[in-house]
Amino acid sequence: MASYKFKTQNSFLLLLSISFFFLLLLNKVNSTGSLSFSFPKFKHSQPDLIFQSDALVTSKGVLQLTTVNDGRPVYDSIGRVLYAAPFQIWDSTTGNVASFVTSFSFIIKAPNEGKTADGLVFFLAPVGSTQPLKGGGLLGLFKDESYNKSNQIVAVEFDTFRNVAWDPNGIHMGIDVNSIQSVRTVRWDWANGEVANVFISYEASTKSLTASLVYPSLEKSFILSAIVDLKKVLPEWVRVGFTATTGLSEDYVQTNDVLSWSFESNLPGGNSVASVKNAGLSTYAA
């Protein structure tokens, strides 16, 4: 019965993903505002990515967000990676908002399954966004746990440690809007060392942000969604990327590795990425 439920849910997720992807392709016919890239694996020399703090690419082409020494993750590590080219998430002239899809695979592995911390996050942020000094439960996203609309951040978190002040019980996925306290969460049965495949989509017409995670080898899947008005939360131009942290004590550690990543956005009638300079933005400035 569990297997049937898994297959049914994942058939729905696959159909949803394919349908939304082709909708983006069709809409691009009448669109000049888009960003598209794909990293089947990563390279040591990756000029189209911005690396912050501990993040790096390993010799095996893995995007390692937090530090690993001699095969063991290090505590109090924090790292972020952003795609260098900004993209237009909404157009102040037309009022149009972009739709987007992204997919990536990651592995979180902990020496002790009962002591994991802290998490991995996909996020959108202002072009000049820098990584806060605080890691741990704030996941390299925010300076503190309070809501602040000036943060201008939307994120999907994969959180492996419960911070009592703002987290629900247990390991979870969450959607964050300007605060580390998620607007929507779902329980996530994290699988130690297993490859997780993630698909995230935003449909501008419905303002629906949806995230799904599948462990193909374990027949486990998870999905959550929330209504988020990106035009009210984010600036007109943003960058997209990942952030991750480990715990603040040496017992609570984990790896945070991204294996592959693709992204596609569509803004009807917007500016192309090549027009970024006309907006007064630098394509590759951190």
UniProtKB/Swiss-Prot annotation:
Glycan-linked positions: N148
Binding site for Mn(2+): E157, D159, D167, H172
Domain of life: Eukaryota
Residues annotated as signal peptide: 1-31
Chain coiled-coil ranges: none
Binding site for Ca(2+): D159, N163, D167
Membrane-spanning intervals of the chain: none
GO molecular function, one term: metal ion binding
Tissue expression summary: Mostly in the axial and ray parenchymal cells of the inner bark. Fewer in the axial and ray parenchymal cells of the xylem. Strong expression in bark. The lectin accumulates in the inner bark in autumn and winter and disappears in may.
Family of the protein in this entry: Belongs to the leguminous lectin family.
Subunit structure: RPbAI is composed of two polypeptides, A and B, that associate into five different tetrameric isolectins. The A4 combination is the only one devoid of agglutination activity. Isoform B4 displays maximal agglutination activity.
Function: Bark lectins are storage proteins that probably maintain stocks of nitrogen during dormant period. Self-aggregatable molecules that can bind their own carbohydrate side chains. They could also play a role in the plant's defense against phytophagous invertebrates or herbivorous higher animals.
Protein name (record): Bark agglutinin I polypeptide B
